[in-house]
């Protein structure tokens, strides 16, 4: 990777903070490129004896083209390259938030010569190309911005701090050491002592196992990044909406004794033990002639198909019914499910204890009361355990999907290297797949990657990052 700034013909600009009408006291317009300082000086009027010095905050006003109207009162910060996020000259204009002020400031900036609107992720892409970040750090910044829980943010910060880069670079260097041993034998075998093939293969096996473990850990980490969708299903009036309100701690669904009150799919986002969870309260599934209720039931089936786990709620006061059994049969076999008996507060403890033998031979996972909260913690624990989310809590690093795919490719290439050794093929056959493994790991950190691939990666980032 390059350590000095790559010259770019154009200076780019974008709003680097979230913008919503009436929200946010401060917004930041960011510029990066050779004309950043010139543009900053052109659009911001600095009173008094303040000097444009790198990494010093100045006070001023963004003026309109005539120089007579003040668009906004701002603070402006110049960061000369390479001591900036992108490695280029960067100017940040800190203006008032909301919508109109920041929009007018950005329009004023974009009206200057040699400035264009930044593409999604272009600031981060320039930081990578200029050696200010490696690719895993840039991706981790994007994940930090998108984090939906404290635990996901902590995991992303490990990547921002270089945790993934150090782990992958270490594995890659170990493979490079083994490749150099093999290539030396290919070219100068007669001049070197015999290669300890067993030791080399043992090292390759160790690296392969570490890569496979990283991939396995990453799958658990996906739960923290993407969250889980939990579908609450059951007959009408078994307490699904009450359970949703209990878990989300706010009144999201209308709760009455009238069957069929929920006629659509309701959602509530919560965080349980660091895992973002979307609770989906489905309309009670039953045979109905009501067209509106049937529409809600159809959407319930769609929500069930998209869920990570189904929580089938039934009424303990009525016991397990044929309708409950019919609903259970509609849950896909490959979808994890929990059987939850609600209204435990209405039943004697002896009766609820015996129900585990009454559900078609299937054990009731949790017995609770959505009204009193009895059994709530047991349900949370069961949901996290069923989805494998509990195992994600101790993760130190977690690769994203792109990184997972490349790590898996590297592990497969190492397996092929081991097969070549088992077949007693010449050294140069060993090196083919070993180079593939090294190249795949280089793609993870950005050391071996094309600009076209970078464009595709950063196009998924938000504008201004």
Curated annotation (Swiss-Prot):
Which keywords does the record carry? Cytoplasm, GTP-binding, Hydrolase, Magnesium, Metal-binding, Nucleotide-binding, Potassium, tRNA processing
User: Binding residues for (6S)-5-formyl-5,6,7,8-tetrahydrofolate, per the UniProt record?
Assistant: 30, 92, 132, 465
- Top enzyme class, one word, equals hydrolase
Cofactor binding notes = Binds 1 potassium ion per subunit.
**What is one cellular component GO term in this UniProt entry?**
cytosol
Which PANTHER family does the UniProt entry name for this protein?
TRNA MODIFICATION GTPASE GTPBP3, TRNA MODIFICATION GTPASE GTPBP3, MITOCHONDRIAL
Q: What is this protein called?
A: tRNA modification GTPase MnmE
